[in-house]
Amino acid sequence: MSDVFAKLGLTDQFEACTASSTFIQQLAAVQIPDSAFNEWLFQDFIFVRVFAHFLASTISSVPNDPKFSFLSETLKGGFDVLKEEMRIFKEKAGDRGVDVPELPSFSASLDAELALDSAHLLVELRQEILRFSPFNDAYCTFLAVDLGAKSSSTFAERIAVLWAAEIVYLTAFKFVLRSEQFQADAGESLKGFMEWWGGNPAFDAYVDTLSVAVRLVLETATEEGKEVVKRGIRKVLDLEVQFWDGSLSAGK
């Protein structure tokens, strides 16, 4: 676990959406109901599309400051990876008999993605996807509207939120992969899917780079700025808990 959570007093909240999450614990024990995992798969497929839009907003807000010169290319690489992630989600969903919806396609460029109206994107999703769950809608609204390109949010808040969301997945799925029960009983397809986040050196490196950026932000932030960052991270952790728990509840 990153010491950033400890410094911000968010250790318990981070644990709640990683190792202490009922969804993650059941997944690690290979006891999660298929219906709950399939619900998460369906909802997260939608979420990734909106997350890509949020990432484009974050890239556009990287300051022209030498100390952040390393960041833009890394984030652009992350944007490209999300396209592959959606393909993998769709493939795994098909393997499990889950029909994922047709979503607005990725824009050809970051500029084109930024030109999309965030609120309109969400309206389109709500109209077209009958199973767009409230917990997913809340998370997507936070990212695309509250922190979107047309919002008053800062780079500091966006990069902290991006990092928090990514390190939750990294940590949660590393926990799953370390489980002896999971390694003994899970199928190879599921193991491979979890390794996309929890066993992927490139994803480790990506999250490490985001961590460096967040530390730089906190080093120079005012007390008010630190509080804004903390609120953003705490919001992500709360929304992650709702996403895991909502998937479990919907799958009953």
Place the predicted regions along the sequence by residue:
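Acidic, low-complexity proline/glycine-rich segments
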Residues: 1-24, 201-212
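Alpha-helical bundle segments that constitute or directly flank the non-heme di-iron/ferroxidase center
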Residues: 12-13, 32-61, 80-81, 160-171
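Amphipathic, well-ordered alpha-helical segments in soluble domains
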Residues: 16-20, 47-54, 85, 135, ...
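Helix-loop segments that flank and shape redox-cofactor active sites
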Residues: 22-35, 52-73, 148-151
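Secondary-structure edge/capping motif, primarily at the C-terminal ends of alpha-helices
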Residues: 27, 58-62, 146-150, 173-180, ...
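Active-site-proximal alpha-helical scaffolds that flank and shape metal-associated catalytic sites
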Residues: 68-205, 238
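Long amphipathic all-alpha helical oligomerization modules
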Residues: 199-233
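A cross-kingdom marker for long, charged
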Residues: 227-252
